[in-house]
C-alpha cells in the first residue's frame, strides 16, 4: 500500500526531511528516512508520525562524533537486534550504529574497520591507484541474511564487507 504524509511546503523542516537520501521500512513497519543535506535520519510510523531523530539539523562535527551525522546516505535495521546501521558518507566517512528503540549510540567504523580520519587527503586519484585507506563517499549499505554488512564507497570505487561488529571481512573493487 502506498501512502503519503507530510507537507514539505508548509511543515517545519524539523518535522519533515528535505533532500531525502536513503529510505528503509523496518521489521516493525517504521519508516527510516535519511536527510543527507541536513545531517539527520528520521524514524516515522507508517502514518507519518515522527518518533525519533538521529543527528541534529545542520550540525556536523566530524566522523568520530557519536551523536551527530554528516550526510547520511543509507539506512538498514537488523530485524534480530533492532540496531540501525547508517552509511554516513557525504560529509563523514563511516558506518555508524544506533539502538533502534532508544537512539543510543553503539559504535562506528571507517574503511577496513579502522577509525575514520577526516584529515586524510585523497588528492588526485585514478583508477590504477590502490584503494584509499579511508572511505571516500560512503554512499549506501545493506545487511544480508549471512549477517554481514555491505558498504558501497562510491568515490572509492569499491564495496567493503563487514561483520556487524565492524570487523572487516573483504573488499570488492
Predicted regions mapped to residue ranges:
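Short loop/turn segments that connect beta-strands within beta-propeller blades
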Residues: 45-49, 99-102, 163-167
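Conserved beta-strand positions in repeat-built beta-propeller and related beta-rich domains
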Residues: 33-36, 78, 86-89, 151-154
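Surface-exposed loop/turn positions within WD40 beta-propeller blades
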Residues: 28, 38, 81, 90-92, ...
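Aromatic- and glycine-enriched pocket-lining scaffold segments that form the walls
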Residues: 70-98
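A beta-strand-loop signature enriched in Asp, Gly, Thr, and Trp
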Residues: 154-173
Amino acid at each position: 500500500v502506498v501512502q503519503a504524509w507530510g507537507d514539505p511546503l508548509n511543515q517545519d523542516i524539523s518535522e519533515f526531511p528535505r533532500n531525502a537520501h536513503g529510505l528503509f521500512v523496518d521489521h516493525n513497519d517504521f519508516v527510516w528516512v535519511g536527510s543527507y543535506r541536513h545531517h539527520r535520519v528520521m524514524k516515522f510510523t507508517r502514518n507519518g508520525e515522527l518518533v525519533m531523530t538521529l543527528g541534529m539539523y545542520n550540525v556536523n562535527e566530524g566522523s568520530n562524533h557519536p551523536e551527530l551525522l554528516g550526510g547520511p546516505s543509507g539506512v538498514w535495521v537488523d530485524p534480530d537486534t533492532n540496531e540501525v546501521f547508517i552509511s554516513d558518507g557525504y560529509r563523514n566517512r563511516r558506518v555508524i550504529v544506533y539502538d533502534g528503540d532508544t537512539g543510543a549510540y553503539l559504535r562506528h567504523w571507517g574503511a577496513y574497520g579502522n577509525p575514520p580520519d577526516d584529515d586524510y587527503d585523497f588528492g588526485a586519484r585514478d583508477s590504477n591507484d590502490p584503494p584509499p585507506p579511508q572511505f571516500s563517499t560512503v554512499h549506501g549499505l545493506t545487511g544480508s541474511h549471512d549477517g554481514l554488512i555491505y558498504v558501497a564507497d562510491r568515490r572509492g570505487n569499491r564495496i567493503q564487507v563487514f561483520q556487524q561488529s565492524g570487523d572487516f571481512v573483504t573488499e570488492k573493487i
